[in-house]
Swiss-Prot record:
It is an enzyme of class 3 (hydrolase). Residues 10-173 form the Exonuclease domain. This is Oligoribonuclease. Belongs to the oligoribonuclease family. The keyword Cytoplasm applies. Keywords: Cytoplasm, Exonuclease, Hydrolase, Nuclease.
Length: 183
């Protein structure tokens, strides 16, 4: 692979958190996928449940308790040996095999939320990304307004599991590329 192609690679990330506020809530799962510029998956990173003390889990609202207990994530978090620092370091170690720091925008759905949590709880991982974002939810919002048929023709499963959510974000961007952008 040429250096130019390597510089076109994209890092996709998704987090699961105990809530929506980075100052009050915590990361409980992180996953990444690296794709080429054409959205072909090159590698799936480690899916890491991030240990959090029980006091943080006890502060989750009903939606988070139901969702993350139902998926088995709460149990994985309790059993995990990864704190936020170790999870960030392991993720960066994986990413360095495929792309240099500062090259890829942060890619995903509603990615600003993930970036907020990374900046607060995993600043080393947040700093690995370029400052730009590739946010699939921007295209979704535009499609809703400019071509609702395209927006409505992609259905998400809503698994709220980090790796599954990334795969779905990539598929959604492929959908918009095929149906929303004219060639």
């Amino acid at each position: 692979m040429t250096e130019d192609n390597k510089k076109q690679r994209l890092i996709w990330i998704d987090l699961e958190m105990t809530g929506l506020e980075p100052d009050e809530n915590h990361i409980i799962e992180v996953a990444t996928i690296v794709t080429d510029a054409q959205l072909n998956t090159l590698a799936e990173g480690p899916v890491i449940a991030v240990h959090q003390p029980q006091k943080h889990l006890d502060r989750m609202d009903d939606w988070n308790v139901k969702t993350h207990t139902g998926s088995g994530l709460v149990e994985r978090v309790k059993e995990s040996q990864h704190d936020e620092r170790k999870a960030a370091a392991e993720t960066i170690e994986f990413l360095r095999q495929y792309i240099d720091a500062g090259v890829s925008p942060m890619c995903g759905n509603s990615i600003c939320q993930d970036r907020r949590f990374l900046a607060k709880h995993m600043p080393e991982l947040e700093a690995f990304f370029h400052y730009r974002n590739l946010d699939v939810s921007t295209l979704k919002e535009l499609a809703k307004r400019w071509n609702p048929e395209v927006a409505n023709s992609f259905k998400k499963s809503g698994a709220h599991e980090a790796l599954a959510d990334i795969r779905e974000s990539i598929a959604e961007l492929q959908h918009y590329r095929e149906h929303f952008f004219s060639k």
